[in-house]
């Protein structure tokens, strides 16, 4: 049994989760760390991850029959909540006809058109299977289109686990305190330039020095993997100006923000168009699917039209396409109003409870995405995010989880709401928060 599933950790599990403890111990004998994505291991907060039996609306039920208000939403995709009838029906209908063909299906065209209709600068779309594939492919395409080798990214922004993009990344790397990953060679990272987020001056300087060698800047349209950190008022627009002036491309990573913060994603908020845009999460309807798209002249460099190769056996999978299309079509204007209203209400409850206990904090927010930063200083980049009082978060997390509220298991992850949050859910949250806030106030730095 490895460190993540140590006897000490298992002993910390309450009597209410024996089945999760048993399954986690069992999983750790056949799956590294007992999980298939690191943040699920609860390593940053302690305890044993809850093994989920089912989800319905805004509620999760674990294998011990405990119910939780879900404020993770599968890390973002489930804006409509779990098992939304329209999505389930679409998946069942598609699955009845066949699970995979390795051939084109009509639904691919419909999903691509839905994305293009929502994000007007996107003229063509290629479907893939994950956000990592989308960003990895967009970077390769940018290099192939420009003939240049270097990519600029920002510290704390996570663009999937492709080697070239793991330098100083957020998400799990931030959670585990890793600057990069063993196995990423110097050659893989040599053409990646990492700059501070929200520092347009640093971008201007590096382009002045190396602009002829830079293929693209890739940025999260609004950062959600160092906690939630919105771009400064002129940051994205500044990136647009600088890349245009130097003949480089701007890759907007909307895997997290796309179709969540508005019908058109972050583009619908700041109107800054990427030459290439990556999508995932919401457009998948909860299935393994993602996409990247952009200007037609760039996208047409992809095989089979052009020389930049990208392929995938399961890309455009008919069941995943059906789920994504149903999810997007159900996400109408009313849905986005509900998401914003639910985020407002939840943030108000969080703020009131923490204020009542005198816990210094800031809410980082980008549309209806947000996170809680403990401490007195505002957060605008990865350095300031790492300087917060993250040691308060485990106590706060377990104060909520033990009372039936499921927040993200890391201080560096974003909280997500769904349209399915109801009065019962908000009552549960309101009841749980005072004790969780007291736990955060009483926490001591190790």
From Swiss-Prot:
Keywords: Cytoplasm, Isomerase, Porphyrin biosynthesis, Pyridoxal phosphate. The keyword Cytoplasm applies. It comes from the Bacteria. It is found in: Cytoplasm. GO terms for molecular function: glutamate-1-semialdehyde 2,1-aminomutase activity; pyridoxal phosphate binding; transaminase activity. One of its GO terms (biological process) is protoporphyrinogen IX biosynthetic process. The modification N6-(pyridoxal phosphate)lysine is found at residue 281. It catalyses: (S)-4-amino-5-oxopentanoate = 5-aminolevulinate. The keyword Cytoplasm applies. GO terms for cellular component: cytoplasm. Its EC number is 5.4.3.8. Pathway: Porphyrin-containing compound metabolism; protoporphyrin-IX biosynthesis; 5-aminolevulinate from L-glutamyl-tRNA(Glu): step 2/2. Signal peptide: none annotated. InterPro entries: 4pyrrol_synth_GluAld_NH2Trfase (IPR004639), Aminotrans_3 (IPR005814), Aminotrans_3_PPA_site (IPR049704), PyrdxlP-dep_Trfase (IPR015424), PyrdxlP-dep_Trfase_major (IPR015421), PyrdxlP-dep_Trfase_small (IPR015422). HAMAP family: HemL_aminotrans_3. NCBIfam families: hemL, PRK00062.1. Belongs to the class-III pyridoxal-phosphate-dependent aminotransferase family. HemL subfamily. Homodimer. This is Glutamate-1-semialdehyde 2,1-aminomutase. It comes from Mycobacteroides abscessus (strain ATCC 19977 / DSM 44196 / CCUG 20993 / CIP 104536 / JCM 13569 / NCTC 13031 / TMC 1543 / L948). The gene is hemL.
């Amino acid at each position: 049994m490895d460190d993540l599933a140590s006897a000490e950790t298992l002993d910390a599990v309450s009597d209410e989760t024996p089945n999760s403890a048993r399954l986690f111990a069992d999983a750790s004998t056949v799956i590294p760390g007992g999980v298939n994505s690191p943040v699920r291991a609860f390593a940053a907060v302690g305890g044993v991850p809850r093994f989920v039996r089912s989800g319905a609306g805004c509620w999760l039920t674990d294998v011990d029959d405990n119910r939780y208000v879900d404020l993770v939403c599968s890390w973002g995709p489930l804006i409509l909540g779990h098992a939304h009838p329209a999505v389930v029906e679409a998946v069942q209908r598609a699955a009845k006809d066949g699970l995979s063909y390795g051939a084109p299906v009509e639904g691919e065209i419909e999903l691509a058109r839905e994305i293009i209709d929502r994000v007007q600068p996107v003229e063509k779309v290629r479907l893939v299977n994950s956000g990592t594939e989308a960003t990895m492919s967009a970077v390769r395409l940018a290099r192939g289109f420009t003939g240049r080798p270097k990519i600029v990214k920002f510290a704390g922004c996570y663009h999937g686990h492709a080697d070239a993009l793991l330098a100083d990344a957020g998400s799990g790397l931030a959670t585990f305190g890793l600057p990069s990953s063993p196995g990423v060679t110097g050659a893989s990272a040599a053409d990646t330039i990492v700059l501070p987020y929200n520092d347009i001056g640093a971008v201007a300087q590096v382009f002045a020095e190396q602009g002829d060698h830079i293929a693209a800047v890739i940025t999260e349209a609004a950062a959600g993997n160092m906690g939630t950190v919105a771009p400064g008022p002129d940051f994205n627009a500044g990136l647009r100006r600088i890349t245009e002036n130097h003949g480089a491309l701007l890759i907007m990573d909307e895997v997290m923000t796309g179709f969540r913060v508005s019908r058109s994603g972050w583009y619908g908020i700041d109107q800054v168009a990427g030459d290439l845009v990556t999508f995932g999460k919401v457009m998948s309807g909860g299935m393994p699917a993602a996409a990247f798209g952009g200007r037609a002249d760039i996208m047409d460099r992809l095989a089979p039209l052009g020389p930049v190769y990208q392929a995938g056996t399961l890309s455009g999978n008919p069941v995943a396409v059906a789920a994504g299309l149903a999810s997007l079509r159900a996400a109408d204007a009313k849905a986005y109003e509900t998401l914003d209203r639910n985020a407002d209400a939840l943030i108000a409850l969080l703020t009131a409870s923490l204020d009542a206990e005198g816990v210094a904090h800031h809410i980082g927010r980008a549309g209806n995405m947000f996170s809680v930063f403990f401490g007195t200083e505002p957060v605008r980049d990865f350095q300031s995010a790492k300087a917060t009082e993250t040691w308060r978060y485990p106590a706060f997390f377990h104060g909520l989880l033990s009372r039936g509220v499921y927040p993200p298991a890391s201080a560096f992850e974003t909280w997500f709401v769904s349209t399915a949050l109801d009065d019962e859910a908000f009552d549960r949250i309101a009841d749980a928060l005072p004790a969780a806030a007291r736990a955060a106030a009483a926490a001591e730095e190790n």
